[in-house]
């Protein structure tokens, strides 16, 4: 089997303190990157002359590439060396960040930030886990795992605030320039990294890898193409689901023939592992839906600056960080299944409270979101603290690395799926509401209704009311007021529809939580601390 624990004993780094800091910095950049993009949506749209749907497609695509290639990337590290995979991952991220600094159009963002940067992310996470395991021993190893995990948690908590401040006070491009500086500093410490030799079987299941890429890619790209009004939606979705079925068949076939599969299908014989993977996916779908819908609402509807949006999102991110930290320290006092069930319940309650507030919130009452978002964030924090260990607990030590890779891929796919589906439903709802409200209007002339609906369907998604008023400057006052009214009514409705994605994900997770509680607890068969990075 390809993904095995390395039997070679770890060797202590020559400068463990500095190497630990550099690895933590790499993880910080990995997590903060998407937060920066989310809170900068309106600025990126304006600066590049593109659309909100285009930028959110790039965000979803970056998560998709990371998910689709993370399994094969871990095998590449086994084959060519974990240090090389780590270096290529850093370089991929650097290329993506540099492209964002210099980008003049959306195509550059998609090619270099989403695709190249996504490939970099898929290489970084599995190689970092192996390198930490191979460069540190004993207490030092546990300390570095804690440092890197803390860096990820802190980045998730303060990323929206950092990104919002830089974007509002200076420019969003500076945030990505700072990422380049951090990555350069991390690359300067490559001499401290000792490569970790892999002594297992050096073969890669290329057919299985292709099926996994087509399965994830077909589903998410189908949703993104639907969002953009493309005609290949059915074909892409069919490719995705057929590839998923072929992947399952192929893995079982290779296992029975004694050949090396991309993933050992017997991993899924464990019911806790299957339910845990599902929970991981639901958690990330919920997070992805919130990540894309709320920043767009805050910036494009309430017209908050990036900093204002970051501050409004702070209750979500800070409560997630605080509760995850607290729950992690108190682990063992409650059954993990009970905590997971409570986590999904809190996410569902938080989203349920947000949905009716959306049409009632004005720019000066955005703080109404604070309590619901804090509740949802607390739920996500509970899930972050428990799901990873629950999922991996039934897996034997020699297969834990492979299982952690599957867990990471499921989470990344869930994030990309949530981003894509929530964004697509929001735009579909916008199109429907624009058309319906324009046709029902008693103010707009009959000959203009179809034209207004078409214009709003194409342009209103990227325009604030202020920008729309400027564009309508030559129209009669009553026409201006009516179009602004349509804009005001359609957008909150669209956000409410988008929020059904995280709500449904939380409810499915809650259902799974009840199933978990009815099952007996599983005592971990391996030390899971080092695999906390994969959650």
Residues covered by each model-derived region:
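Transmembrane-helix exit segments and adjacent C-terminal regions of multi-pass membrane proteins
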Residues: 1-31, 253, 272, 389, ...
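Extracellular/periplasmic helix-loop-helix junction of adjacent transmembrane segments
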Residues: 40-68, 107-110, 302, 307-312
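Interfacial helix-cap and linker-helix signal at transmembrane-aqueous boundaries
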Residues: 44-45, 76-77, 162-170, 223, ...
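Helix-loop-helix hairpins in multi-pass membrane proteins, especially solute transporters
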Residues: 75-208, 225, 230, 234
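Helix-breaking motifs and short loop linkers at transmembrane-helix boundaries and internal kinks
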Residues: 47-49, 81, 102-108, 170-171, ...
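Hydrophobic transmembrane-helix bundles of small-molecule transporters
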Residues: 168-280, 286, 304
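Central cavity-lining transmembrane alpha-helices of secondary-active solute carriers
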Residues: 60-74, 125-129, 314-327
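12-transmembrane solute porter fold
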Residues: 17-32, 37-39, 52, 233-236, ...
